Each structure stands twice: as C-alpha cells, then as structure tokens.
Amino acid sequence: MRVTIAKRSASGHFPLPSSLACRLTEAMRVLAIDPAVRNTGYAILEGDPRKPTVLGYDVINIPARIPQSAALSAIRTHLVNLIKKHQPDEVAVEGIIFVQSHKTAISMGAARAAALIAAADHGLSVYEYSPKKVKMAVVGKGTADKAQVAFMVRALLGLAETPPSDAADALAIGLAHLQASDPLRAKLLDRRLV
C-alpha cells in the first residue's frame, strides 16, 4: 500500500481535495418544505449558510372543501412545478412530530408523502430535520415558538416583512439544511436522509 502526502502550496496551506473544493465553490440550492394537507409552506434558498439567498417562499393553501386526495395531488403538482422551475440540488423536510390526534398524524403523513414523492420522481435526495433541531439551528433554543422562529428567519435572511408562519417554518428548515452542509453541523442537527 502506497501513501502519498499532499504538498503545501506556496502560501503554506495544504490543497483541498477536488471534491471538497468543488463543493465549497458551488452554491447549493435547496427546496425546503413544511408539509401539511391544507397549508404546506415552502422555500427555495441557495448559497452559503452564513449568507443565503432567498429565491422564493410561499404557502400552498388548499381550501377545506377540497377532498384530501385532491389536496395531496395539488401539493405534489405544485412542488413538481417548483422543482422544474428552480432545479434544487436537494430537498429538506420537517421530520414527523408527535401529535395527540391520530387523524392529524395521518393527514400530516400524507402531505409529507406527497412531498417525498415529488422529490423522488425527480431523483432528489431528501433530508429531514426535527422541529426541535430546526428551532435550535435558527433561534438557538429547541422550544422556540412560531413567532420567535418567524422573527429570527426575517432577521437572518434580511427579509422586508415577516413571512407567513408556514413559509417561515420552511425558511427555517432551509436554513438548517444549509447549515448541515458542514459535516459537524450535520451531526448536531441530526440530519437524516429519508
């Protein structure tokens, strides 16, 4: 077995491996999703986790009179259109949370499935983050409320106005995902490939 030692450059630094150098120079684009049957928040962010660029965010609002199957189809279609338009490198979603109602859990799981299918149909890797870890990454405490998350998202991203709650959650998920591009932060944020 032969071992080669990297030579220092003229500046005295060791060169970066080509795969890492490429990763550091290319801006990652992420589609972040806060899935729900009636109000799915989404955000598209790009770039360095310390200074990301917001390419867009909104909430997919589905009226209550629309049957759940049609709502899920609409969510998937909307997300597919976003994927085609923005061409994200990866997708980040909120992990499953504990809820008291079985009906709510099933509904949330169905919306999440619509998002996962939209990403899988386009060959995108999907990563999930627990709400607690997202709050920790953005606010600094895992028990932050929605208003604190929205405030910090606005401040960190330099937004002119506070985004709607579900969109703010998606922006926070996107910020956490960009932070997790650092391997150490990925471990702290408990980044999981879905």
Model-derived features with residue positions:
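Phosphate- and other anionic-substrate recognition elements at nucleic-acid/protein interfaces
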Residues: M1-F14, S19-V194
